[in-house]
Design a protein with these regions (language model features):
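Cysteine-centered catalytic environments shared across enzyme families
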Residues: 1-302
C-alpha cells in the first residue's frame, strides 16, 4: 500500500506551496512509511508515499521517463499482475527499462498507448501521469476499485489523493458537508454511493474509470464494466475453469522482493489461498511460506 496525491493549477507556483504540499504528504504517511517523494514543475505538484515491495532502488517515485523528446511523470499506488507480459510488449516496441518495477511498466504503457493503456492493465491500482509537453494529468483507477482515488475540481485546477484528508490539508478544500453528504452518512454509511466523497465537492474516481484533466477541463471515461451472462458450462467445466482462474490469480500475486506472509482465519477461502501458494512455492523452490493466525483466551469456547 502506497499513497499518492497531486495538485494541478497553472495559475499557482507550486514551488511556493511546499509547506502545504508537505502537510498533504504527511496525512498519507501511514500508507507509505519507507520513502516519500515530491515533483514540482510550475503549476504541477505530485506527491508519493512509498511502501517498498518491488525494486527498492529503481522503483522510487515520482518516476520520470522521456520518449521522443516528451517527458512523463507518474505517481502510482498498486500492484500489476501482468507486468512481465506488458514489459515484453513494450521492449518489442523499442522501450527500455532501468529496473523491474511495475511502476515503470505502467508509465511506459501510457507513453505508448496513452489512455488506452487502462484496458491492458491487470491488477489493483490508482495512478496519475503528468504529460509535461501536453500540460495534462491522466488519472486512472483499477477495474473493481480496490485502490482509492479521490479528487476535487475547482475553477482553474484540480487536486487528487488516495485519501480525503490529504485534500483537506491543502486548504483549498473545505471540510463542509451538504445535504448529499448527510444522506451518505446517515442512510448509507459506512457504504457510499459510487463517486461520492461525502464532503462537499469531493468526488471519487469510480472503479474502472479514468479521467484526463487538460485545459481546465476534466473528461472522464469508463473503460470497464462488469457484465453478467448466462452460465452455460457443465459442472466439470465450471470446476476446471474456477481452479484455473483461482490458481492463476493467486500465483500472479506472489511476486515480491519482500517476504510474504499469510493470515489464516480458519475459513475455506484463506485455506485455499495458502494451499495454492504453498504449491507454487514448492514448485519454484522458494522455501516454506509463513502463516499467522489469532488466538485469544477462551477461544475454544466460541
Amino acid at each position: 500500500m502506497c499513497g499518492i496525491a497531486g495538485w494541478f493549477d497553472n495559475e499557482i507556483d507550486m514551488s511556493k506551496q511546499i509547506p502545504v504540499l508537505y502537510k498533504m504528504s504527511q496525512t498519507l504517511s501511514k500508507r507509505g512509511p519507507d520513502e516519500n517523494g515530491l515533483y514540482i514543475n510550475k503549476g504541477c505538484a505530485l506527491l508519493h508515499r512509498r511502501l517498498i515491495v518491488i525494486d527498492k532502488e529503481n522503483g522510487k517515485q515520482p518516476m520520470a521517463a522521456r520518449h521522443r523528446g516528451k517527458t512523463y511523470i507518474i505517481v502510482y499506488n498498486g500492484e500489476l499482475y501482468n507486468t512481465d507480459e506488458l514489459r515484453e510488449d513494450l521492449k518489442a516496441s523499442g522501450y527500455h527499462f532501468r529496473g523491474h518495477s511495475d511502476t515503470e511498466v505502467v508509465l511506459k504503457s501510457y507513453m505508448k498507448y496513452k489512455e488506452k493503456c487502462a484496458d491492458m492493465l491487470n491488477g489493483i491500482f490508482a495512478f496519475a501521469i503528468y504529460d509535461v509537453s501536453e500540460n495534462s494529468i491522466f488519472l486512472c483507477r483499477d477495474k473493481i476499485g480496490v485502490k482509492p482515488l479521490f479528487y476535487y475540481e475547482y475553477d482553474g485546477g484540480i487536486l487528487f489523493a488516495s485519501e480525503i484528508k490529504a485534500l483537506l490539508a491543502s486548504k483549498i478544500v473545505k471540510p463542509q458537508i451538504d445535504e448529499t453528504g448527510l444522506y451518505e452518512i446517515f442512510f448509507l454509511g459506512p457504504a457510499r454511493t459510487p463517486s461520492c466523497g461525502v464532503f462537499k465537492g469531493i468526488k471519487e474516481l469510480k472503479p474502472g474509470e479514468s479521467a484526463l484533466y487538460k485545459n481546465q477541463k476534466l473528461t472522464k471515461k469508463s473503460y470497464f464494466t462488469i457484465q453478467a451472462k448466462e452460465h452455460t458450462d457443465s459442472v466439470e467445466e465450471t470446476v476446471e475453469k474456477t481452479r484455473f482462474l483461482l490458481t492463476d490469480a493467486i500465483n500472479r500475486q506472489l511476486v515480491s522482493d519482500m517476504p510474504l506472509c499469510f493470515f489464516l482465519s480458519g475459513g475455506l477461502d484463506s485455506s485455499i489461498i495458502v494451499k495454492t501458494a504453498s504449491q507454487y512455492y514448492k514448485e519454484n523452490k522458494l522455501g516454506k511460506i509463513n502463516t499467522y493466525s489469532v488466538e485469544y483466551r477462551d477461544n475454544e469456547k466460541f
